[in-house]
Amino acid sequence: LIVGTALAVGFMFDSADGQVSRVTGASSKTGEWVDHVADAFRSPAIHFCTAAAVMIYRPESWWLAVVALVYGWVTSGQFMSQILAEQFVRAAGRKQTRGGNLRSFVLLPTDPGVLCWSFVLWGFGAPFMVLYTFLAAVAVAHSSMSLRRRYRDLRALDAAAKQAAKEAAKQGESRA
């Protein structure tokens, strides 16, 4: 209960600091960078600590440590993919597409806050294992779909940039 609450409170502050800086006009590239770096360390750290705790306190459930390691690996890669793709899309002058309420609801199991609250069940053994494994499976499925979609989107940006370069070269030749 204490771990779940502490993680949730930490996540709440992590979410709030960016909102407060935007509302007050105090946001900066440095602040955004620090926030992303902290997130990049926090995300896999939760799972690696879970793997270590499983091996220390529940070694008979070693398979859950493997789930935790895979979960950490996937969330780390997903985070990097998301950050880079957003930067590339923004740099290309394209608008970011966000899903609606249904998408937010469907992706709720991938929300770090849900993960944090799942640790409230740690002391109950099996319910935690089932929920944590479910959250990991959803993260793997979401990451697979998201990575494929992002790759297609970025390939389309590359194709559009190549086409624009060809057209610019043709216009340059016709002027010469």
Predicted regions and their residues:
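A feature for the membrane-embedded catalytic helix bundles of lipid/isoprenoid biosynthetic enzymes
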Residues: H36-K166, K170-A176
